[in-house]
Amino acid sequence: MKKVFIALMALSMVCVEFTSCDKDSGFTADPTTQPIAGKTYRETVSADSYSQFSFHMNYRCTMEAKKPGESPVANSYFEWWMSPGDNEVVIRYAQGAYDKTTGKSLSGQTFLSGSYNATQNTVTLSGDFDGQHFTYTLKEQK
């Protein structure tokens, strides 16, 4: 099991931590995903928010989403994949995902989605969490 820490922070101080990833989870790396596999991306747009991704494509990871000082509101797995045709990037809740507060299933729902720009080597992601919309532009850290 590969240990990974990923945090997304924004002005509302929502923090999403992907606390562990398992390369033997049954997800396989598609050759079309390799341009961003295993690289680290950091947000470059806003000084008020911070994002860092350091993991391999198509790993399944444990996720806890929470606000500072609060219990996690979701505990699930996510899948990160990239469409070979249009460089679409999607992070979605995998089978078994659920909202800890309501108990409602989140399986298959999109958490963040966006695209990979091969020219600028950036990933742009957007999505909704806890009633707020977030947009992240991530650039590979050399």
What are these regions (language model features)?
Residues 131-142:
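Short, low-complexity, Pro/Ser/Thr/Gly-rich segments in the mature regions of secreted, periplasmic
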Residues 4-13:
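Sec-dependent N-terminal signal peptides
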Residues 53-55:
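Secondary-structure capping and domain/repeat boundary segments
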Residues 1-4, 22:
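Positively charged n-region of N-terminal signal peptides that target proteins for export
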Residues 29-51, 78-82:
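Tryptophan-anchored aromatic micro-motifs
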Residues 14-40, 140-142:
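Bacterial Sec-dependent N-terminal signal peptides
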Residues 38-40, 57-62:
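A short glycine-rich beta-turn/N-cap micro-motif
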Residues 46-48, 62-126:
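Contiguous, well-ordered beta-strand patches that form the walls/edges
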